[in-house]
Amino acid sequence: MPRVKGGTVTRKRRKKVLKLAKGYYGSKHTLYKVANQAVMKSGQYAYRDRRQKKRDFRKLWITRINAAARMNGLSYSRLMHGLKVAGIEVNRKMLADLAVTDAAAFTQLADAAKKAVAK
């Protein structure tokens, strides 16, 4: 029987990859070589999309704020400028949440922005 050098390390590495590939379709969860490629690619997708998610949510918040602002007779850019001039520091996430859940509070902020821009 030939001597095996690093056999336990190799087995551990392969088991780790196959564990990460659990739930993949077809041979991607059983064959090491294919599973390794799939796991590497999924890691690339995960890395890319963690950054993409931040952009997607910001786009969603801006869309919601713009829709609510236009219902109050303002564009998104004028609303944001008015809030900045008025000294109201509310981030886009909170503004979007107010626009969806509490329209009255958002209207008050929009009115404050209108007054600040009018000055």
Swiss-Prot record:
GO biological process, alphabetically ordered: ribosomal large subunit assembly; translation
One Gene Ontology MF term: rRNA binding
Pfam families: Ribosomal_L20
Stated role: Binds directly to 23S ribosomal RNA and is necessary for the in vitro assembly process of the 50S ribosomal subunit. It is not involved in the protein synthesizing functions of that subunit.
Cell wall biogenesis/degradation found in the keyword field: no
CDD domains linked to this entry: Ribosomal_L20
A GO cellular-component term linked to this record: ribosome
Gene3D superfamilies: 6.10.160.10, Ribosomal protein L20 (1.10.1900.20)
UniProt-listed InterPro entries: Ribosomal_bL20, RIBOSOMAL_L20_CS, Ribosomal_protein_bL20_C
UniProt KW keywords: Ribonucleoprotein, Ribosomal protein, RNA-binding, rRNA-binding
PANTHER family: 39S RIBOSOMAL PROTEIN L20
Organism: Lysinibacillus sphaericus (strain C3-41)
UniProt name for this protein: Large ribosomal subunit protein bL20
Gene: rplT
Record keyword RNA-binding present: yes
Entry's family note: Belongs to the bacterial ribosomal protein bL20 family.
SUPFAM superfamilies: Ribosomal protein L20
NCBIfam families for this protein: rplT_bact
